[in-house]
Each structure stands twice: as structure tokens, then as C-alpha cells.
């Protein structure tokens, strides 16, 4: 992957963290790299099972039982925003999925506190229990397939799958997908 990224024109900076490290040391490293680079660092790719920051007090999918902190890798991408863990108290009827309380390690913000400076992505095959392969083997398989795609060793079918069930509660949500998918794969290659 490193050579593929360099071949694509990226400058790669790498740091290895123990998977039990919480989100703050990883973010501090990202901030340090960003500042040392003179803002040349533009993207962050997290590979492996590292801390997933949780933040906020909302339910983006409209399910009230999920109100609380949601996964927020954007925490890593916001270099200078003020993220706090002191005010949100979630009353979500005992749901174990998304609790958020003051000083619990989950951030308060439901809205990103400042414009993000970085793109962020994650390749994490942890808890993929539906597969017989280990986390390491699944990651290796993904990276090998990624390499094959970049070098045109495979040519996957161009198609998209569109689920419109949220249109009932949030009108026109699928319109964005239609507008995005059609130019990428063509109208006839979209499956509902």
C-alpha cells in the first residue's frame, strides 16, 4: 500500500500505535504531523483496529433508541476545533450502544466545531465475524485487491445498490444517491 500511495503522488508518513491506544494520543500525533509539515499533510488513513472516537447526542438514522454518541473519525480530521467531554448527558433508556456522559471519553459535539483540515479514511476489519478469515488476513486481502484494482489487474463491474427506505422519514434522501451514482455507473446499473 505504501508504494501504491507513493506511486499515486502521496507523501507517506507512518506511525504505529498499539490497538488499545485511545483516540487522544493518535489525534495529538496527527496534529503534530500536520503542524510540522506546514499544513502539507492533507489526509489521514487509519489502518487496523484503533480507537474510534464517539461524539454527540443525536440519532442520524432517525432511530430514537440510538440517540447518543456516534462514530466520529472526523475528530482526527479537525486539527484546531475545540472538542469537549463535559456537558452531554444522554438519556437513551438504558441503550448500551450510544451512551454519552460527562468525562466518559466520548466527545460532546453533535456538530463539527470548526472546518476540518484533513480527509480521513479507515480500513478496519475488526469484528468481522461473518468471515472465516482473521482480521489480519481480511486486511491483507483488502490491500491486495486494492493493489490489483490500482494496477488494472482486475476490472470489477460498475454497479451501485440504492436503498430508499429513509425517504419515508426524511424525504428525498435517495435523490443525492441517484445524482451521485448515475454519472459513476449509469442509470441501468443501479439496483434498488
Task: Walk through the language-model features, giving the residues of each.
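Cysteine-dependent hydrolase recognition
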Residues: 1-192
Amino acid at each position: 500500500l505504501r508504494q501504491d500511495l507513493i506511486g499515486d503522488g502521496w507523501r507517506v508518513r507512518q506511525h504505529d500505535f498499539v490497538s488499545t491506544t485511545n483516540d487522544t494520543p493518535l489525534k495529538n500525533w496527527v496534529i503534530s504531523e500536520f503542524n510540522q509539515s506546514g499544513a502539507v499533510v492533507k489526509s489521514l488513513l487509519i489502518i487496523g483496529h484503533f480507537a474510534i472516537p464517539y461524539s454527540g447526542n443525536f440519532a442520524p438514522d432517525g432511530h430514537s433508541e440510538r440517540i447518543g454518541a456516534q462514530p466520529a473519525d472526523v475528530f482526527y480530521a479537525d486539527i484546531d476545533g475545540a472538542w469537549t467531554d463535559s456537558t452531554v448527558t444522554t438519556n437513551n433508556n438504558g441503550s448500551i450502544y450510544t451512551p454519552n456522559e460527562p468525562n466518559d471519553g466520548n466527545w460532546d459535539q453533535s456538530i463539527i466545531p470548526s472546518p476540518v483540515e484533513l480527509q480521513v479514511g479507515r480500513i478496519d476489519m475488526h469484528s468481522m465475524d461473518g468471515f472465516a478469515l482473521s482480521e489480519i488476513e481480511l486486511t491483507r486481502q483488502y490491500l491486495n485487491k486494492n493493489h490489483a484494482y490500482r494496477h488494472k489487474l482486475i476490472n470489477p463491474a460498475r454497479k451501485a445498490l440504492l436503498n430508499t427506505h429513509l425517504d419515508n422519514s426524511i424525504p428525498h434522501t435517495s435523490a443525492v444517491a441517484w445524482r451521485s451514482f448515475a454519472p459513476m455507473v449509469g442509470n441501468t446499473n443501479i439496483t434498488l
